[in-house]
Amino acid sequence: MADDITETSQTVAAGQLRALIERIERLEEEKKTIADDIKEVFAEAKGTGFDTKAIRTIIRLRKKDQAERQEEDAILDLYMAALGMV
């Protein structure tokens, strides 16, 4: 009886593990598809004449809140002033 419970537990654990791995694999495939889509959009932007580096910077900045951006700008200004760049 104890062997049956252990075997059942192992079967359930193996099934759960397999399901988790398959979910991760599907998500990885979706991630790859999305990355390819993003790459295509950047290629389209470049083909239209937009600067993709600037677009990436804007996207990065839009992810941050205003206070965080202001703090980074202040530090950047301070460092540039210290180096005589402004």
Curated annotation (Swiss-Prot):
Sections of the chain in a coiled coil: none
Gene Ontology molecular function: any one: DNA binding
One protein family per Pfam: GapR_DNA-bd
Signal peptide location: none
Family as reported in the entry's similarity comment: Belongs to the UPF0335 family.
HAMAP family, per the entry: UPF0335
Protein name, UniProt field: UPF0335 protein mll3968
Organism encoding this protein: Mesorhizobium japonicum (strain LMG 29417 / CECT 9101 / MAFF 303099)
